[in-house]
């Protein structure tokens, strides 16, 4: 079994390399994002960000961490001062509400658990956050640090 894994590893790496050469892509460069609980509703000062790299004109997708249908979800830019998009759950007969906000020099698609940045520029480098608020008004954050070259 181990031998089969080692034999197939170069093929997987070659596939990833060929995909990145012929299709715009970015590759996660370090650890996966971690969800941090915030006791004061603010982004924790000691939060650790997952590092991502991207190429100009490429795309990158960040995945939000766990959520439930009753959670309020937000994708944020910078230190959380700019909202990219928000999702509000179905509340007593209402439909789920989804808001997308215009951000200068940022082209994106947003879903409740993914943020895809499109046609990257170096101006898109920086920190992005996934914020989740549960029914008990407890806030959780995940951090993504993007470098575009």
Swiss-Prot record:
Quote the subcellular location field of this record: Virion membrane
Q: What does its PTM field state?
A: N-glycosylated and possibly O-glycosylated.
Q: Which UniProt keywords apply?
A: Early protein, Glycoprotein, Membrane, Signal, Virion
Q: Name one GO cellular component term.
A: virion membrane
Entry superkingdom: Viruses
Whether Glycoprotein counts among this entry's keywords is: yes
Specify the signal sequence span.
Answer: 1-18
Q: Which residues are glycosylated?
A: 46, 51, 59, 67, 105, 109, 119, 136, 145
State if Membrane is listed as a keyword. yes
Q: What is its main location?
A: virion
- Membrane-topology annotation of the record: Peripheral membrane protein
According to its UniProt record, which protein family does this protein belong to?
A: Belongs to the RL11 family.
Q: What is this protein called?
A: Envelope glycoprotein UL4
Gene from which the chain derives = UL4
